[in-house]
Amino acid sequence: MVLTLLYVGRREGLGHERTRPTTNAGYEPGAREKWMRILFVHPEGNLANNPNLSAIIELLTRSGHEIIVRSARGNFARHENPNVRVLEVRYRIQRKLMQLSCHPRKWFLGKLLITLVPPMTPPADLVVGVDRQGLIEGAVIARSKGIPLAYWSYEIFFATECSSDFKALERREASSVRFAVAQDDLRARLLSEETGIPNDRILRIPVAGTGTRPAARTRYLNERFGIPADRRIAIFAGSVDEWTLARPLVESLPLWPENWVLVMHHRYGYVSDWQRSARHRMPSRFYLSEDSFPTIEGLGHMLHGADLGIALYNPTYDTPWTGRNIANIGMSSGKIATYMQYGLPVLINELGEISSHVREKGLGAVTGDVLEIPGILYHFDPESMRGRCLAFFAEHLDAKLYLPDLQRALSTAVAT
């Protein structure tokens, strides 16, 4: 529940002051607290499908801060909390901004689009740019309003994998950020090397939502797809592009134990031709979900009906997104974290820090090759791992664990 707060005044400096209503249990009557109006610039527009960013915004809102999100227009740009204000940028404008950000000499046109074309940005205390594009656009807003800038990095773009023009504006604007966020020590070091942001200014916050979702294994998927009750169900959620190894995984199905089946679910309900063909060839082994859920919570019904969550990452080096960024994914997989949040054991490949945790803490299995998966499944006991997955999420991944450090960084940025 988000508390309603009464504005009682403003002052220069750190945030503003409000008084909590005396009827709110757990707070001192008339207690005053500092709060901030924080603007997140998130051009990608998929807030509803980013479990970490959604959770962070929810937690900051519950803490009394006012949150505004500037994002590309679309159904997935909105936050489920009605108190989070979303400034929707028309698709045509957002696409143009992305094009211009790759040409530093033309970026003055991007600045004009941001400052003169709706939506107009209200006053704020601090801007958080999400990923490269959010940093570049957020810097324009922060500079125009004379407020500090922070950088939340989910993707790392390497100079060796993209053009100098593509990196130029990111490097320039990164020089003015008060702090940044990466997911683990390795990604923080790489982000520092690629942007020039000092490593000691980078917080470590894994990609994960907040709150475990324990539940007994349901028959949701069995009933949804007509899967026999004696089958164990592996689910593969998310993109099926080449870097996910989705196609080799499906091709390995004839070698799986007879009591295992695979369900694939794309976040937006997309189904490719090769998937339809595979379903036609293996109707009793391979099932496709064409549902599209407006929030991460909708996916939970599917995860509670599965026995295993599969997440595979294989760098293809054909775009700046799918090279070293994928090779060093570490603790930045929201898919793996979401599986564990729902008590679902995981099957992953060699991904750095998260793979070590899975091995050492008994959270599932780690494979070096898709062809090893059938052998792993013959001896896999998911029920013994569910509790450990929930505990690991609660103790290491939950976004609320990192809220105190984040709030200190926000307060320091605004105060200096």
Give, region by region, the residue ranges found by the protein language model:
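Conserved donor-binding/catalytic core segment of Leloir-type glycosyltransferases
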Residues: V41, I227-T244, L249-L253
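Active-site proximal beta-strand in glycosyltransferases
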Residues: L126, V140-A159
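Nucleotide-activated donor-binding/catalytic signature segment of Leloir-type glycosyltransferases, i.e.
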Residues: W274-L308, D318
